[in-house]
A protein has these predicted regions:
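Buried hydrophobic positions in well-ordered alpha/beta secondary-structure cores of metabolic enzymes
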Residues: 21, 109, 167-169
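Acidic, glycine-rich flexible loop/linker segments
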Residues: 140-178
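Protein maturation boundaries and topogenic segments
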Residues: 23-32, 105, 112, 121
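Intrinsically disordered, low-complexity regions enriched in acidic/Ser/Thr/Pro/Gln residues
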Residues: 1-81
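Ligand/cofactor pocket segment of small-molecule handling proteins
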Residues: 106-141
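Extracellular/luminal Protease-associated
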Residues: 77-119
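General beta-strand structural signal in soluble alpha/beta enzymes
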Residues: 30-33, 88-90, 117-121, 135-137, ...
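Short coil/turn connectors at secondary-structure junctions
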Residues: 49-50, 82-85, 112-115, 130-133, ...
Length: 178
């Protein structure tokens, strides 16, 4: 879909997009949208509409690849592809111990073309993220702990959704649909 057409979808909230999808395909009444409670940092900004850049993280397991090596590969992956983008990060732990998302990663992802993040993990540094960058997360955490990227560009499942790399997503204060 062309960039300007994507921007036009920001005029609609996510429930309206869900209604339209349900008219086109009744299976969207039970799939494709978030079904769990989450925290929305900026409820008043326009909805995010963009292409998914997926990853899995862990704060209890660590990747065999060096931390800096996999992060650089991941940032190159996020930089590739069509704009705009939405980072979709699956935390492999039911109760996240640390936050991948804060001032540093929000600014890096913003510069790489991401409008925000959808994660079942935690976020922090709320007062210093870029102005129109959105956090839709399961929880807040004061610590980044020792979070490792485990893999990226793969399918992730959380909050009742299944999202693949490059899926088109619409998300706002109400939730997300892909």
């Amino acid at each position: 879909m062309k960039y300007k057409k994507l921007l036009k979808l920001q005029r609609f909230d996510t429930p309206t997009i869900c209604n339209g999808l349900e008219l086109l395909d009744a299976s969207f009444k039970i799939k494709g949208y978030s079904k769990e409670k989450f925290f929305c940092l900026n409820p008043k900004i326009k909805p995010m509409v963009g292409y998914a850049k997926t990853a899995k993280i862990s704060s209890l397991k660590h990747n065999k690849k060096t931390k800096n090596s996999i992060r650089m590969d991941y940032y190159e992956y996020v930089n590739e592809g069509d704009y705009p983008k939405i980072s979709v990060i699956y935390d492999q732990h039911k109760n996240p111990v640390g936050s991948f998302w804060g001032e540093v990663n929000a600014n890096i992802h913003h510069k790489l073309g991401c409008l925000g993040v959808i994660t079942n993990g935690s976020v922090r540094d709320l007062d210093v993220i870029p102005k129109n960058f959105q956090f839709l997360s399961k929880t807040l955490s004061p610590s980044h702990a020792e979070v490792s990227l485990m893999e990226f560009g793969t399918k992730v499942k959380f909050m009742g959704m299944e999202i693949k790399d490059n899926d088109l997503i619409h998300a706002d204060v109400h939730g997300a649909v892909s």
